[in-house]
Amino acid sequence: MKFYLAPMEGITGYIYRNAYHQIFLPMDKYFSPFLAPNQSRSLKTRELQDILPENNPGIPLVPQILTNQWEDFVWATEKLRELGYREVNLNLGCPSGTVTAKGRGAGFLANPEGLDRFLDNIFSRSTAEISIKTRLGIKDPAEFERLMEIYSQYPLKELIIHPRVREDYYKNLPNLAAFARGAVSSSCPVCYNGNIFTQKDFWEIETRFPQISAVMLGRGILKNPMLLEEIAGENRREGSAGRTSEEKCRLRRFHDKIYTGYQRIMSGERNTLFKMKELWTYLGSAFEGGERYKKKIKKAERLKDYENAVGALFEECTLIGKN
């Protein structure tokens, strides 16, 4: 079984990836937050910085592309090839309204025939290995049957299935029955993505779907960066589900690497604080209690106040036990 880090817009950029890769059990692949090539055949400076090889040393990175124009996709794959990337991922899963309103991400799933033409064009013109990250459809999981018919016509590197429809966003439980039908009918390797927050969650997916080749971890890793180690059994102590002081120290080092990384590239305290507060919306779940410190982190307007709140949280609060 292989493990991938999901692309989480605004969070899992190269600062986060480097810190995670250096401190915790490495992923087999890391997927970048989406790149959105525009009609002028260019990428934003921020997007380009995120995928530059020198900013991702030793990291097996797969750039993700968001577009519904085959010409832009092919251009982007050639640009990425110049940077050394052989595999790219097509985003057909983003549920954001600003994305889907333009018929991109999960919004592209509303136009199966247009998607079919798009795939025909990119597979006939691009030299890249192409994987797809998809949802089940827009409103009804039954839409996935037609989508699978389309996907099966093309030589996908891999199909990453998030078994929710666009209208679910991240609510409701993943539709495992629909995922099962997709996994059985797929002509390429299948990766599961969705609601793996604990070791038990992973075991249930692995047991039910022994044919899948990989699992993609997203919010579960953001909430508990040691999740992959727990799944692999690399940080469990016999007879105890408690956390060790070494684990807490590693989590602090992880935080500090991200913090100093953002200070280095962001302009001004406000922007650094915004990025760190976004991280804490997930990372705060790793701690027992400490609500008053978490509130201080959220309300901090100066880096000094932020540092004091984080220091107190790590000093006085324990990590939630393994489950």
Located regions from the model:
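Flavin-dependent oxidoreductase catalytic cores
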Residues: M1-N323
